[in-house]
């Protein structure tokens, strides 16, 4: 049970104490090492009565978003460290560019159990098991209201693009859907055995 972050992690001052005190809350690991919070964490999980350790890693891309440390080098270094403790490693790559996320998936193939992309709010349909045994999807998508523009009020979003001026965007409320993936991981090898994309309820 944890929540990963991204480019809005530090948007609210309340995040300071939450990230410092709650190990369930992660922020991108490729921020500077002096930034408060955790970029990865190992959590106990129970599967069929057995207790296992699942590591969750959070990194953020640099294309169109931020000039952070290299997510490729950061994730690789963390994975090497975590392998000494567990081979069940789940990576959330928060990124804007699909090419960057796909390249990252190839780079981490065989090094981690899963690479799941986030950020764009739009689910992709390219879920797969890569040759090295890593489950991958470019973007898991958004859980929220689809009667809008990536979760925001559609009228305000249209006005912002139409007039090219700022408009306050409230959260959309209608047509709520769940976007998710379920990844099956072999607890012995750490390789993914399956990945299933979820989008419910679907569009009519």
Predicted regions: what they are:
Residues 1-204:
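Acidic, metal/ion-coordinating pockets
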